């Protein structure tokens, strides 16, 4: 379930060492391989409000918010996006992100002081909770990422799930592996002495995983283990979809791909997708709206957050539109000086 990755990358990089990369990923875009009829059907399912594009502008009563959907891993394709956003960054009074420098420092401190956030401190270990076959497959997947299996035996299931969503070719993690669009904008903002503020408290992400039962977390881990052979292809598909402005198309594809997992039923896939969407996207979107609107009262705002938060009926763009904001595709030529 690659949708977990953006929300937990910060936690993952706070735990794992960042070393020199040993390889480069060359995955296949799985959406591009679909037969025309299946692609047409997928696109129809993915057609929701504001489904296409990563950069948007919201205006209301003279207030202006530039919204940038982000992808959280480094990629050279960010260069033209950063160039396009330069006028908005130069005129902004604040940069809003999911987690700013203060929040990142706070979560690292919290992790160091509370091992239970990321580790099983009591009860059965993962080898005891998973089937022998799943543990053997997990051990193989971990070894391909340069990790000894015992290192994961007491990790929280959601953390191992997130780890497996990063394909083996990314390991060991390179310095700067997390330099996605948001991090690069933060660096530019800091150089301009522009305030950087968070859309949510540092511990909001911890509350998200509290909404998943232990059984849900184990089920997600088992599904991710079963799909590990395609992790490189899924990562490539996600990146390509993002840079094509089609992140929601990938979201729809990943939901469909769940049905190919062993034992997965439509009812269970729908239940899990609803749970993930509500906990990781919809609830957070609703909580961000007051923060965005309050920031806009003091001047132009540039907000950068995961691209999957933009589209859909419960997406940030539609929620703003329902509150009277005019939503238009971002055009740097129209950014006021």
Residue ranges of each PLM-predicted region?
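Nuclease and nuclease-like effector domains acting on nucleic acids or nucleotide cofactors
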Residues: 2, 22-23
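C-terminal soluble interaction/assembly domains
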Residues: 274-337
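Cleavable N-terminal signal peptides
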Residues: 8-10, 20
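Bacterial N-terminal signal peptides that target proteins for export
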Residues: 1-8
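N-terminal signal peptide c-region/cleavage motif recognized by signal peptidases
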Residues: 15-19
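Structured, acidic catalytic/metal-binding patches in enzyme active sites
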Residues: 23-47, 52-276
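Hydrophobic alpha-helical transmembrane segments of integral membrane proteins
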Residues: 3, 13-14
